Amino acid sequence: MSEFNITETYLRFLEEDTEMTMPIAAIEALVTLLRIKTPETAAEMINTIKSSTEELIKSIPNSVSLRAGCDIFMRFVLRNLHLYGDWENCKQHLIENGQLFVSRAKKSRNKIAEIGVDFIADDDIILVHGYSRAVFSLLNHAANKFIRFRCVVTESRPSKQGNQLYTLLEQKGIPVTLIVDSAVGAVIDKVDKVFVGAEGVAESGGIINLVGTYSVGVLAHNARKPFYVVTESHKFVRMFPLSSDDLPMAGPPLDFTRRTDDLEDALRGPTIDYTAQEYITALITDLGVLTPSAVSEELIKMWYD
């Protein structure tokens, strides 16, 4: 048997299921690790999970989201180790319940859509930054409920995620227009609310997300427009950044080294940023509608209850 590679396993799960989020793929990979590695003691299991988690985080750029999944799985393991006297039963329990957790987490978007649909009214114009599966699930659910609304989608450079969301909304028959990121300030007074997803939700209630989210949050705040974060609770992560400078980045936010004459290839910069809690109206999650200050309470429940 070839040596187990946590990174390759993680990437394979993402490739096989395009709807899977990074935290869930991380948990799936760690469950697979336990099944293959078969540690002989609790201490060996914890060390194996820790070392594999560190390896995975180091190997994946923008690892905030998968870090949340690794944290959740470690918490799950630590809380369940003492429940069984028999080690073999303990291992089997962790594997089976890890898979059960993954199954439930995959359904969280449906729950978010059911909760969040009350935030969309007839004739709303909704600004969306980037492509979030949770946001799309909510918008699709609202359209299926025959709520008449329109969407303004940012292009979301450099990833151009907005193009993907624009195409999906068009296919669903939802009226939508695509704008460049720099046009948000020009249209913010014409929209009714803003929806964004999240790569991770920090302990403070602020969010780590696609670059440009912070700019949209500031503009929405100044224009007194509601700014809603639509996200799964398994993206709550034990981090407390004060600004985007505190985020784990693949490279420096500003790089003046010239590497190419192609302007498109020369386009560089951060891929994620941090939006502080004061710009966020509420978080629409599978746990319900939360204020930013409630996130730390939920993390405490997750880790210490």
Swiss-Prot record:
Disruption phenotype: Inhibits GCN4 derepression in glucose, amino acid, or purine-starved cells. It is found in: Cytoplasm, Cytosol. InterPro entries: eIF2B_alpha/beta/delta, elF-2B_alpha_N, IF-2B-related, IF_2B-like_C, NagB/RpiA_transferase-like. SUPFAM superfamilies: NagB/RpiA/CoA transferase-like (SSF100950). GO terms for molecular function: enzyme regulator activity; translation initiation factor activity. Keywords: Acetylation, Activator, Cytoplasm, Initiation factor, Phosphoprotein, Protein biosynthesis, Repressor, Translation regulation. Pfam families: IF-2B (PF01008). Its main location: cytoplasm. GO terms for cellular component: cytosol; eukaryotic translation initiation factor 2B complex; guanyl-nucleotide exchange factor complex. The modification Phosphothreonine is found at T291. One of its GO terms (biological process) is positive regulation of cellular response to amino acid starvation. The modification N-acetylserine is found at S2. Acts as a component of the translation initiation factor 2B (eIF2B) complex, which catalyzes the exchange of GDP for GTP on the eukaryotic initiation factor 2 (eIF2) complex gamma subunit. Its guanine nucleotide exchange factor activity is repressed when bound to eIF2 complex phosphorylated on the alpha subunit, thereby limiting the amount of methionyl-initiator methionine tRNA available to the ribosome and consequently global translation is repressed. Component of the translation initiation factor 2B (eIF2B) complex which is a heterodecamer of two sets of five different subunits: alpha, beta, gamma, delta and epsilon. Subunits alpha, beta and delta comprise a regulatory subcomplex and subunits epsilon and gamma comprise a catalytic subcomplex. Within the complex, the hexameric regulatory complex resides at the center, with the two heterodimeric catalytic subcomplexes bound on opposite sides. Belongs to the eIF-2B alpha/beta/delta subunits family. Present with 8970 molecules/cell in log phase SD medium. This is Translation initiation factor eIF2B subunit alpha. The gene is GCN3.
